[in-house]
């Protein structure tokens, strides 16, 4: 399990850093009452240290105001981690594996920030699925931006409009997809 957690920590950190992008200079401005809520989703398939990773960004916004942001990462486990878990009952290990992963990857520090919820699950298919559910209306941007590895994403959200944030994801290769249910 320690090997698995170390592998996951490195892989997730690399995946998060690849999305840090370039922060824009525009500050978020309160949206007009006429602005309608829009939800857009984008997906980026990439290799991180030779392993397949899918990152899905879903942003709900009205004008220049974020309403909800979800970043979902599905990462293939390294073969040695898959072997270590083979034949084990993942449902009984889920809590322990999730807790260890969160600690080793720094995700546990994000969970302490107001406005962020993180869910981690290791699947039977040999992937780790991480969901970052962000409530921008309650997010402590300053605290989030200080979390190692993940801070640049929150600096980017703070300094960019939702459309600029989405554009930076597209610039990295993100393609629009239908919104997840």
Positions of the model-derived regions?
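Bacterial N-terminal signal peptides that target proteins for export
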Residues: 1-2
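C-terminal motif of bacterial Sec signal peptides marking the signal peptidase cleavage site
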Residues: 10-13
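Bacterial signal peptide processing site
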Residues: 15-17
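N-terminal low-complexity, Pro/Thr-rich disordered segments
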Residues: 20-34
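Subset-of-secretome marker
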Residues: 31-181
């Amino acid at each position: 399990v320690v090997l698995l957690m170390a592998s996951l920590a490195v892989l997730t950190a690399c995946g998060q850093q690849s999305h840090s992008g370039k922060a824009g200079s525009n500050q978020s401005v309160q949206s007009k009452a006429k602005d309608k809520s829009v939800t857009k989703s984008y997906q980026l398939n990439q290799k991180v240290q030779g392993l397949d990773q899918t990152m899905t960004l879903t942003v709900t916004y009205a004008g220049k105001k974020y309403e909800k942001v979800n970043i979902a990462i599905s990462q293939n486990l390294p073969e040695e981690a898959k072997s270590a878990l083979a034949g084990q009952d993942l449902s009984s290990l889920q809590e322990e594996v999730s807790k260890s992963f969160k600690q080793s990857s720094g995700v546990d520090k994000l969970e302490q920030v107001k406005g962020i919820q993180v869910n981690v699950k290791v699947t039977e298919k040999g992937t780790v699925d991480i969901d970052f559910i962000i409530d921008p209306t309650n997010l402590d941007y300053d605290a989030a931006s200080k979390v190692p590895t993940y801070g640049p994403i929150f600096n980017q959200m703070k300094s960019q409009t939702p459309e600029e944030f989405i554009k930076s994801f597209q610039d990295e290769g993100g393609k629009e997809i239908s919104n997840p249910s």
